[in-house]
Regions:
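Bacterial N-terminal signal peptides that target proteins for export
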Residues: 2-13
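Bacterial N-terminal signal peptides
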Residues: 13-21
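Acidic, Gly/Ser/Thr-rich repeat motifs that build Ca2+-stabilized beta-propeller blades
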Residues: 28, 65-241, 289-292, 297-305, ...
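Beta-strand initiation motifs
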Residues: 91-97, 137-141, 194-205, 265-276, ...
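Surface-exposed loop and turn segments in beta-propeller and other repeat-based domains
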Residues: 141-154, 203-218, 264-280, 327-356
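Beta-propeller blade signature
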Residues: 187-195, 246, 250-262
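Conserved blade-ending motifs and adjacent loop-strand segments that build the rim/top face
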Residues: 399-418
């Protein structure tokens, strides 16, 4: 296979004589599931909201001197079509379906793209391989195979995360998150080989390692944010109830959202990080999947709960660093263990659901594809019940979460491609895409 890199050219045409105006989780037990269309109320308490950005108004451009009407003029480039506005209510799901893309994968747990215009989808197989989907076909040979160094002694271990460097087209770098043969977390950098559909298996450079006290709550997500830094989700270290109180302990990196600069190996700490180390946010139990809205930079974190509540957390793009999402003082928006300090500013989730409805939340992607009715809708699911929710802010800024689809899938992740289309993964081997009927 050959892949051509898309190069975009832009030009600015000036037409004299005209005014230019700038415009601005283990196997589940049976659960009770709500029917599609049932509303799940947002959690109460303090929740960050996105601030509206004012549209700047520019002064009219200088008209210049009159030109000869007979003189040839340059053709005017038509303006780019405006992006659809975000919806403020959830769409009727009856006109849409989850259409199969490929099957035959071995425990797929994540999907992403290289952002290079190729259209290729890269699927993470938990045992330790990365597979390519090209033009709707699963490529037989894996892009990367590190099964010999990936440990999967527990059901939550394995190859868990994949992120391509923003300059992948130039440097060929990508990053993975896996548990090693000892069960510890490894974040490592690899490089593509001369063959674009094959990684260099021997190019591993270890960026970060974390000792894991138990076999679960490993987090796993890695993603480049709009700031160009690598974001890493870490679980609280496992067992039940965070027995080591890692999530609230700023001296350890477990139960956190980390943010590092990987352009200087092994890595450096961005100046804006609030505590002078890798930590950007804390108080998380197992942020298995998180997602930056590619259009706005807003952050959604699906944090897997303990025995009662699954939650979705949110930060606006301009949020102050150092957010505390409350675990293990709270599970969701509800008291769990101990009393937080009087000056603690705990951020409650914008959506939650209880365990009669499911058992393990799977985030999540903000739809930015071709269907206007879905613009700005955050889609998330539950691994155990197969339910799929939509989440939006209404015209008054209130969060609305509602079950939109009931499936028989085991969904470890909801992901999207570089065009903003959204996909479901079924741990039993299938990838599906949201489409019109």
């Amino acid at each position: 296979m050959k892949k051509s890199n898309a190069i975009k050219y832009s030009s600015l045409l000036i037409v004299l004589g005209l005014a230019v105006i700038l415009a601005g989780c283990a196997a589940p037990s049976p659960v009770e599931t709500p029917t599609a269309g049932e509303t799940v109320q947002p959690a109460g308490g303090d929740q960050p909201t996105a601030a509206a950005d004012p549209t700047p108004t520019a002064e009219p451009a200088d008209r210049g001197e009159p030109t000869d009407p007979a003189a040839p003029t340059a053709p005017v480039t038509p303006p780019e079509p405006e992006a659809p506005e975000d919806v403020t209510s959830l769409p009727d799901p009856s006109g849409y379906t989850w259409a199969g893309v490929v099957e035959g994968l071995n425990s797929p747990v994540g999907l992403t793209t290289a952002g290079d215009g190729s259209g290729w989808l890269y699927v993470i197989e938990q045992p330790g391989r990365i597979r390519i989907i090209e033009n709707g076909q699963l490529v037989e040979s894996p892009f990367l195979d590190i099964r010999d160094r990936v440990g999967d002694q527990g059901s939550e271990q394995g190859l868990l995360g994949l992120a391509f460097h923003p300059d992948f087209q130039e440097n060929g770098f990508f990053f993975v998150n896996y548990t090693d043969l000892n069960g510890d977390t490894v974040v490592a950098r690899y490089q593509v080989s001369e063959d674009p559909d094959q990684a260099d298996q021997d190019s591993e450079t270890v960026v970060l390692t974390l000792s894991q006290p138990y076999k679960n709550h490993n987090g796993g997500q890695v993603s480049f944010g709009p700031d160009g830094y690598l974001w890493i989700g870490t679980g609280d270290g496992g067992s039940a109830g965070d027995p080591q109180d890692n999530a609230q302990n700023l001296d350890v990196l477990l139960g956190k959202l980390l943010r590092i600069d990987v352009d200087q190996l092994p890595y450096s700490i961005p100046e804006e990080n609030p505590f002078g180390d890798e930590i950007w946010a804390y108080g998380l139990r197992n942020p298995w999947r998180f997602n930056h809205d590619p259009a706005t930079g807003e952050l959604y974190i699906a944090d897997v709960g303990q025995n009662q509540w699954e939650e979705v957390n949110y930060l606006p793009a301009d949020a102050e660093p150092g957010a505390n999402f409350g675990w293990n003082y709270r599970e969701g928006a509800h008291p769990f263990e101990g009393t937080p300090p009087a000056d603690a500013e705990l951020i409650d989730p914008v959506a939650e659901y209880s365990h009669p409805t499911g058992c393990s939340v799977s985030g999540g992607a903000v739809y930015r594809g071709s269907m206007p009715a879905w613009q700005g809708v955050y889609l998330y699911a539950d691994y155990c019940s197969g339910l799929v929710w939509g989440l939006v802010q209404d015209a008054d800024g209130n969060w609305q979460s509602e079950v939109l689809f009931r499936t028989d899938r085991r969904i470890p992740a909801v992901s999207q491609d570089e065009n903003g289309e959204v996909y479901l993964l079924d741990i039993r081997g299938e990838v599906l895409r949201l489409e019109e009927n």
